[in-house]
Amino acid sequence: MTKDNKTFEDRLDRLKAIVSALEKGDLPLEEGVALFKEGQTLSKECATQLEKARNEVKIVTGGEVEDFDVDTEEDTADDS
């Protein structure tokens, strides 16, 4: 975890809540600006965490990072 003990998922959940609140459009200006700033910070922190994870995967895989397929329920249903 990071120094403030928030996980990537914690940050992402908060970012989703901020986006939802901003999309409603009924916030006072000051609150909207504060949430926007918080969202920008969270977005940068998430991007940093993702890049760090990607680099760790590169190290583990010897520099090879490939996209992978995630089976969804629809995909597995089509395969049967």
UniProtKB/Swiss-Prot annotation:
Its EC number is 3.1.11.6. Keywords: Cytoplasm, Exonuclease, Hydrolase, Nuclease. It is an enzyme of class 3 (hydrolase). InterPro entries: Exonuc_VII_S, Exonuc_VII_ssu_sf. Bidirectionally degrades single-stranded DNA into large acid-insoluble oligonucleotides, which are then degraded further into small acid-soluble oligonucleotides. Heterooligomer composed of large and small subunits. This is Exodeoxyribonuclease 7 small subunit. It comes from Maridesulfovibrio salexigens (strain ATCC 14822 / DSM 2638 / NCIMB 8403 / VKM B-1763). The gene is xseB.
